[in-house]
Every structure is written in structure tokens, then in C-alpha cells.
């Protein structure tokens, strides 16, 4: 059983498939009818007008109707498009068990517990026949698919077949029937239009279900005696053929399969059983743990069944319908009707090659599952689930094409899956041992190879390679070298599709498509809500795949879309241009022609083949919101512009692409305040002053307009704005403009007119306007405000705009491939005079006038050519400015900037100093100073094997910042970085560049070393360790001038390494409080480090005292002797001699891992001695030694390099590379 869909609900008592749509009706014991889309797995609708359980439900074959019958004695006919019940049929006197539409006539047959069967005309909404004769509940009734018969089953232990031929004749030619019974008589005694033809007796208990065979004169029935009986009938009689036994409880429902010779039954024993209708034997049984089955339904066209049970229903198939096929070159090989066939794509010729052996068993799902073809040997491998998984090898002679009688003995073998891996070799998966067997064409094992992962299936992955599928991932396995060539996380892969060049692979699972390259490096993943069925690569590298109801595409970057909607699932075999070759579920080759222009267009954009894009824009009918949205998302709004006619969309795209001209044209058409506002913002961002001015004029945003005039230096226009504000009685606007102008007299006048005499007096007095101040003082009388004494006065005037000009100069850029010529109107609007305009964007030929002139003409519209009447004149008389003496008409933005701006030509860029620094340098410090951190890291990795760059990050930043100086310029200009060179002088040639001046130098390292020595002497071990490590981390980035200094740097590394090792051991020793032996060993190893003599004396004294305390007298005596050899001071010498005397001739109380007689070095990670002659590995940078097991790990001394890594060596001077 292949479950396609499952629901959880109350007990399902009735089921019905829609004949064409992927819908199923389920009627529940709770009284609800559900309509599901079983393909998408969604609940489409629910209908709940019945009172009590609904036991019968059925779709009409052609109309948007379904019928239902329930325990409320009602039959309801529904229209699922309008979601309502059309009418209710009354007549039954007890529960209604089943209802069914006639396939041709407007009839409904219903079976009821009132012991009758009724036939209704749903068009006239009347009962046309009552079939009486059963003497117990009638459990089901159904029409014959072709003849005028009805079959019914009843708890009176009989199955009855009724002849309704007379009813049909009366319906076809309704004549006045003088003997026609009244409706009451029909209800009581039944009509004469339907008579019993056969009564089938044989069941020992009540019969629950009976149904006709779709084509043969057979009936199948199931009863409470747990038996399924098969009956045959002819024109005169009917008889029992056989009895199928196996159910353990009442048989609820039974029916013939529409396309196969099988019978399907279900029962209250919680099982569904499949029977062979010809051999009358059980084939398969499917069980549920807790749910009894009540109803079955078969799809009239497709190979689908549904079963209702106590907690829902399931939609399932009995067998896979996917044909086994393999594409090779221009041919597809496939299996159909137990024959191996091939189909040529170019000639579209289908040829039958050879018959395929039928499986011996009668169980389901024995058809071929996969097929693999070897073109050189003309051999075919067919795998199936026969005998738990097996394969058959056919070698087809060249001359056998078309000979259906040709039959050969296939070479067989057991195996989960089998594929060809070479010309005459194939691989077979042996699941039990998780190994692959390589066999020749004689079916002999040539080689066995264990697989690297627990493999469920194998697929071809190139000659000699297998793609192994596990539950959660796939790997490519080289059979010859037994190596994994690639691995990818991809759960539950079902199919693998390689491109023709074997460079790309698509991994298809139930609801996902994963695209990867030939080494299984992930490219993209697509997730689908419904099942993915098949796929193939087209010649452009686009993957075309199918789901249950769509053909879709996937571009190399993961973008996808729908090409075509499907009615039935198909399996793609080949894609050639606009033609998709495929197989359907019946194994027929089909050709589907599609429009590939959408994905070809997107692919050309992705690959930047703009000539193709331009050609497609001009010649094809690409349109629609999806293409526009895609272009916008991918950063091509200028291309999307040429598809758009809607002005609002054009405006948005024009702003996004920075195309001010089209934005202005669209804003004029829309003429909406919000769009002018947005246009102003974009024009301001581009520095296009003329357009900004025009946008502010259209929105009457006079405050912004006045400020724009101020910052661009048009002070005369600020004066006009002041007059306009005065005419509008806008005191604040008037005062702001007077402030912008620095006109104190005007400000006094405005304040006086506003009645603010004290403020006017203060302003006049402050600015030295004594006459006006005296006049105002006389008016104020005693209310004269007092001015603060001793404070200096200052003139309130805005600074003069230094960069006052028209439009900002913009760098000239290359025209995009899409600019110009794509549509006639766009070309006319966008035509430019390049020579005249240069980079000054103030030259657009726009219909604009000055704000003052616009005010004079009515104030609403600023477009003089539009000639529009002022729509707001009647309401806003305060805008009337006719009496003003205004200057001549302001210039449009075309000439807005020409008075002060000239053609701007950007200077050619030179080579950055940082690039000069790194061109011929192999020194990591200089690359870091130039800001090329990635190349610096690569150099350090190659030279010193450094892998951990975290400690070097702040040093890189310090080097880069320290080798540059930064110069602030104007507020509108960016900060200018200046490279600081080593040995720079004014007399140097500008074409000769020196190396960068580095902040880290070798003398600095010597100063740090002295500080670290002092911290060590003072016993500040953590601080000393930090300082030594800072030296070790900085050394790779310093640069010295001579070979002698290079040697000194290398010597410094050795010194620091010894101290870091010793200090780490000492800090480790102090952490160990309980392990006294390990404490003594670490103290002893510290004495083996090469230290300064002053520090060596301290270390020896510490080790001597520790060993003496723990009664290791021999070792303590050794340390005392070494201390005396290192010129100790008087106190140290006295102490050493005392220990020597006490320990003379005594032995150690415990054995230490320390032999001072045998030369050794200490492992920097494990702190154990590595004696001479033992194997070790070293750090490529600091030279620390380690036991071999540490190889490949990070060095614990320098914390930078990888132990045992290959490296060329320290490079810290230009002299080393000469």
C-alpha cells in the first residue's frame, strides 16, 4: 500500500472521489461532510446540515453536485460551488445507508433501513420508483455502470439484482400510463418500473455490501459471516462462483478494482484485504492497530482507493505507477506491458525490443522499479522488489528490435539496487552486509567493496563511481580507490538526475529538490508543498522538474517558477528547447510544448548575457507583474521600466534606478503630492537642484524651498520667498526668510507689524538702528525692555555658501546595455545632448517657472504650459499676488545651474599607494599596513603555518591605522586617507614610493623583552607570560632592514619560546595542589629551559627546595650542584651547600619522570620529556617540540601555527627575497 493522503477525524461512513478534480468527499458519523483536496492535503469545505451520522455520499459525474443521505431520513443534494444545499428529498422512513447518482440519467438511488430502495429524479425532485422486496435493512444499493440494473445487499442475507429497464424506457419516452399507480400506492407496494431479476442467497448472515464488476457480468458481496462471495450472472440466472475466506470479523465493504483483476475488501477486523479475482486467493493484507474499517471507494479514472475507518480515512494506491526508464543519448529505454522498449526523441519512433519475464509471485508492487542501460554492450539491468529485491540482466542483440517473440533467459540475482558503473561492469547493493558487488556481464562477481555509509540505494555517478544514498545524506564513492569523493546532507533522496555533461546533479526527494555539482557541493535547495515526481536538465543548465500538478524550472542560483500546469502526473525524460518529452503512468511517450521564454530570460540576466536580454525584450511578449517584480528584486529596475505602462509603477522603478527624467514625466502624469515629495527626496540625493526646486514648487513646500535657495546661494530668490510669505500673512515664514537674508531692518519691520514692539525694539537697538529704536521707545513709554550690560553684540547672518552652484557634478559613467532605444517614447523623453550637458544634471528640459511667477499666476500649478485654472482660487483668496512687482520669469531647471557650473571632468584615477606597497612585497606586515588583510593572512599561513589569526586581528588594525594619516576636508567631502611612507622626504620624486612606515619595530620588541624579564624576576608570572606572548604575536608583522637583524629576530623567537614554555609549566605547577610528584616534575622541566642566568638561579632554587621537602634527595642534590655552577649570590650558595650536605649519598623517595643524564626537550602541550632519539614534531613558527600525537593541532606555545604544518619559514626583511 502506498499511502497518498490521510486524515484524522470522527468515524468515516461514506466516501466518494470526484471523477476529474483531485477531491474526495468524506461523510462522518458526527454529521459533517468534508471535502478534501487529497493532492494538496487541504480541507476545501465542510457541510453540516444533517442531524446525526451521514452514511452515504456521492459526486455527480458532470455537474457541480453531490448527494448525501443520513440518519435523519433526508437525502440532500448540494452544489459545492455555491457551498449550499439545493434541496432535500423526503420519503425514507429510517436511516439512509447509501446514495448514488446514475452515470447518465438524472437519477439517485438510495438504500434505507426502512427495507426499501428508492430511485429519485433529482431534476424534478420526485421519487420515480420504490424497490420493495427485502425484509430487513437494505445496507447498500448501486447502479450498474452500463446496464439497466441495480444491485442491493440486505441484512436479510440476500443480494438482489433489480431490472430498471422499464423505468429507463418510461424516462426516454414518457407516455400517459393509465395504469400508473398513485404516489401512495408506490410507497406501499412498489412500482412496476423496477422488478427483481435475481435473488442471490448463500451468505449465512446479513450482507453489508454488494457491487458490480465494471465490465464483466460479476458481482462481489461481503457479509457478517466474514466471507466475500463472487457471483456470476447471465440473462436468465445468477450463481455463486467462489467464496473468499480470511477476514476475522464482519466484512464492511467490497469492490472490484477498476483496472486490475483484483478484489478489495475491508472489515471490522481492522484490515483491508486484496484478493486475486482470477485465482481467488489472498494477495496482501493491510492492518491498522485500533481502527475498524467501514467503507471503500475507488476512483473512476485513476489507480486510487480510499478507505474510511474509526478515526479518519486514507487515500492509497496498491502499486507504483512510475514506469522504469533510463535515458541514453537520444534514446529512452523503458518497460511497458512486460516489454522492454525504446523511444528515439528526434524521430519520435517507438520500438519494442524484448519481452520481460513475469514475476512468479502474485503479490503487489512486483513491477520494475529502476532501469539501467549500458550503450556499448546494449545491456539492460532491471531492478524490482521481487523476492525482497532482485535484478535481471538482459543483453539485447542488435537485430532483436521489433521482435516481440524474442525471449532470452535473463541473468538474475538478489540485490537492493543495481547500476552499470563501466562498459561491462555493474554494481549490486547487498544491503545485509552493506557492501557493493561488482559483477561482469556473465553475472560473476569481480570485486567486493564495503560501503562507507549505511546505504539504502546506489546510483550511477560517472565511470567507476557510485552515488550512495543513506537516510540523511548522499556520498559519491570511488570503487577503485575506495574513497569518498563528496558528501552532502540530503534526507530521503528518491531519484538522482545527472546533467548530460555530468557536471551537475539534482537530488529529488518527496518534497524537495537539491541541486549540487559533481563533487556534491551544495548549490541550492527548493522545497515543494506537494510531491516531486521527476526531472531533467535542459541544454542551458536549467533543471526542469515536475510535481503532481506542475512543470517547474530551477535556475542555477535557486530561482524557480511554474512553466505549465498539469492535469495528470508525468515523468520527464528529456528537454529539448521548448519541447519536453515525458512518459505518463500508462508508459506512453508524450511531447509537451511549453513556453521557455521566462526562464531563458532570467537565465540570461543571471549570466549577464545582456545582448540576449535586450533581444528578448524587443522581440518577445514577456510581460506581467512576476517579470517586473523579478527584475526589481535582482537589481534591474531600469529593465523593468520597459515592461511597465502603469505610471505609479514606472515612477517607483524610475526612482529605484535613479532615472530622474522618467520619474519627472510620471510624476507629472500622476500629479500627486506624495509623489512630488518622493521625487524631491531622490533629486536632492542626486544633487539635482533644479528638480528639487520644481518638486517643492509643486507641493507648495515654501519652507524647504527657501532653505534650498539659502544653501545653494540664490539669495535673490530667498527675497522673493519673503515677499510671498508676507502676502500669505505667514509671519514665521517671513521672519525665517529675513533671517536667511540677514536683513535686520526687515526683521524689525515684521516684528513691529506683528505687534511684538519689545522684540522689535531689542532687534533695532542690537543692530544699531537708532532712529527706529527711538521711535519704538516713544511708543513703548515705560515698558521699554532693558538690555543686558557688558555683553558684546553679534550680527545674526548665515554664513555665505562657499560651494553655491547649481546641480552637483556627477562622474560620467558608461551607459547601461539597456539604455536608449527600447521604446520610442522613452527614447524621445530621455534623449540628451551629452556635449552641452556634461555632468551637470540641471539641464533637463522641464516645464518649470519660478515660485514667484507661479504665485502671480494663481499659485496652484507651476506648469505654465498646462494652462490649468486655479482650482483653489475661490477658497484661498489670500494667495492672490497680482499686485506684486515681481522680476522676470524664473528660468526652468534646464538653465538652473549654468550660471555658476561648468563641465566637470573627473581626473583619471592613479594607482593607490597601498597597491604599490603590496605589488612586489612578500612581507606580511606591509600587506597588513596596506589594508590587504587577506593576502597578509595567506602569506603568514604559507610562510609560518599560522592558522589562528584571532590574536593578530588588533595588530593588523593597528598596523593599517598607524601607516595612514587622515585629513579632514569640507563638511560635504569624505575624509582623505594619506599613506605614511618610511623615510619620506620633500625632495623625493612623487613617482618613487617607499615602503609603509610600520608602528611595530625590532627595538620595540627589545624594550618589551626587558619589561617581560623584569616581571619574571618579580614573580609576576601571568603578566610576564602576557608580555612574552605579545612579542611572539608581533614578530611575524615586523620588518627589518639587514640580514643581521633577521638573525636577531630569529634568536628573539627562541628566547621568548623558552620563557613561554617555562612560565606555562610553572603556572600549571601552581594549579596542581594534590599531585606532588607532578609538581616536582614540572619544576624539574623548568630547569631544562634556556633562561637568563638570574632566572635560572631562581628556577633551580625553587626546584631544589620542592624536591628536598618531598624527600627526593638525589634530585635535590643535583639541583643544588647546578645552582652552585650558576654563580649564585651568598645566600643562595649557602642554602645550596646545606642541601648538598644533607642529601649526600641519599636516594629519592619517589620515582619521577625525569632523567637529567639523558638530554631531552619538553613537549609544549603535554609537558613530558622527549628524550634524544624519540620521534617528535615541531611548530613551524616558534620551533616548539611536541609528541607526535599533537600533530595537526594548534601550537600551545605561540597560539598561532599548526604543529607539523609545512611552511617556508619566517620572512621579515626585503633582503631575504633578493
UniProtKB/Swiss-Prot annotation:
InterPro entries xrefs: Beta-prop_COPA/B_2nd, Coatomer_alpha_WD-assoc_reg, Coatomer_asu, Coatomer_asu_C, Coatomer_complex_subunit, G-protein_beta_WD-40_rep, TPR_COPA_B, WD40/YVTN_repeat-like_dom_sf
Gene Ontology process terms (BP): endoplasmic reticulum to Golgi vesicle-mediated transport; intra-Golgi vesicle-mediated transport; intracellular protein transport; retrograde vesicle-mediated transport, Golgi to endoplasmic reticulum
Membrane topology label: Peripheral membrane protein
Gene3D superfamilies per the UniProt record, alphabetical: 1.25.40.470, YVTN repeat-like/Quinoprotein amine dehydrogenase
GO cellular component, one term: COPI vesicle coat
Entry's localization field: Cytoplasm; Golgi apparatus membrane; Cytoplasmic vesicle, COPI-coated vesicle membrane
WD repeats: 7-48, 49-88, 91-132, 133-172, 202-241, 246-285, 288-326, 363-404, 450-489
Subunit field text: Oligomeric complex that consists of at least the alpha, beta, beta', gamma, delta, epsilon and zeta subunits.
Listed PANTHER family: COATOMER (PTHR19876), COATOMER SUBUNIT ALPHA (PTHR19876:SF1)
Protein name: Coatomer subunit alpha-1
Lineage of producing organism: Eukaryota, Viridiplantae, Streptophyta, Embryophyta, Tracheophyta
